[in-house]
């Protein structure tokens, strides 16, 4: 048995930047264990599987080690594949996920994610967190299963060299570091060694928390963002009450088949 897959660089308009994700469009669900093994084989930060349900698509995301409840860049990648490879009609796709209903609109050359806003709240720093990051935070907030850590500058975000083993021992599945940007409204990086991903190149789901945080801090609803990982990526963001819009480009870089037997 063979399955067709497509690899997309999300939040980028050119190959070999942004965040890569593999997408499988399935006729029916595979066993959870098999989907996890496939994701482990690809060894990217996320592999997405989609199955049609009525007029919508149910979507699931797997890192190399675990299934996750929400992933932005792999949803963007899935929408790109459905539109560009499988010729889905219209300008809007509906996804059903563990995090609820998600929508992706095609607007000119960008895809726009409509995701739930996740408003962070103060939790305070700890010695363990500061030792893991290797520098003192300005502020620390919690949002669902992630920490949002404000640093003093974009330079500090770019220079951050965390101890990934120490981060993985914290009671959080991921850590966002962020600061006011020099060219963009804000910059960030995202570390998730507890999920098998030391650093995620561009993280749409992290912006569910970053957008409401920076919208309030900067007193503006529309924001530009850069995730300053080695691959990097640009995002155009907007706070819409209890929802956020996250826009970006995507490019197909590879297609192939995986043998299951």
Curated annotation (Swiss-Prot):
GO biological process entries: biosynthetic process
InterPro entries: Phenazine_PhzF-like
Gene3D superfamilies tied to this protein: Diaminopimelate Epimerase, Chain A, domain 1
Coiled-coil blocks: none
GO MF, one example: isomerase activity
Keyword Electron transport recorded: no
Enzyme active site: 46
Gene Ontology CC: cytoplasm
Keywords, sorted A to Z: Isomerase
Top EC class of this enzyme: isomerase
Keyword hit for Isomerase: yes
EC annotation from Swiss-Prot or TrEMBL: 5.1.-.-
Family as reported in the entry's similarity comment: Belongs to the PhzF family.
Record protein name field: Uncharacterized isomerase PA3578
């Amino acid at each position: 048995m063979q399955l067709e897959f497509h690899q997309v660089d999300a939040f980028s308009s050119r190959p070999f930047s942004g965040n890569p994700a593999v997408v499988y469009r399935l006729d029916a669900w595979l066993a959870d264990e098999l989907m996890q093994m496939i994701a482990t084989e690809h060894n990217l930060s996320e592999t997405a599987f989609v199955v049609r349900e009525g007029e919508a698509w149910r979507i699931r995301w797997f890192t190399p080690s675990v299934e996750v409840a929400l992933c932005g860049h792999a949803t963007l990648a899935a929408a790109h594949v459905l539109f560009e490879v499988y010729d889905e009609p219209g300008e809007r796709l509906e996804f059903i996920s563990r995090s609820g209903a998600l929508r992706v609109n095609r607007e000119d050359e960008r895809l726009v994610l409509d995701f739930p806003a996740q408003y962070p709240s103060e939790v305070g720093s700890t010695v363990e967190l500061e030792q893991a990051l290797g520098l003192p935070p300005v502020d620390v907030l919690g949002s669902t299963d992630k920490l949002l850590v404000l640093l003093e500058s974009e330079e500090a975000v770019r220079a951050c060299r965390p101890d990934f083993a120490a981060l993985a021992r914290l009671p959080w599945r991921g850590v966002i570091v962020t600061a006011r940007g020099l060219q963009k409204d804000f910059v960030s990086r995202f570390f998730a060694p507890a999920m098998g991903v030391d650093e995620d190149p561009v993280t749409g789901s992290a912006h569910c928390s970053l957008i409401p945080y920076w919208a309030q801090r900067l007193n503006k609803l529309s924001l530009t963002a850069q995730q300053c990982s080695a691959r990097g990526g640009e995002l155009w963001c907007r706070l819409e009450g209890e929802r956020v819009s996250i826009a970006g480009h995507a490019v197909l870089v590879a297609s192939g088949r995986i043998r299951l037997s």
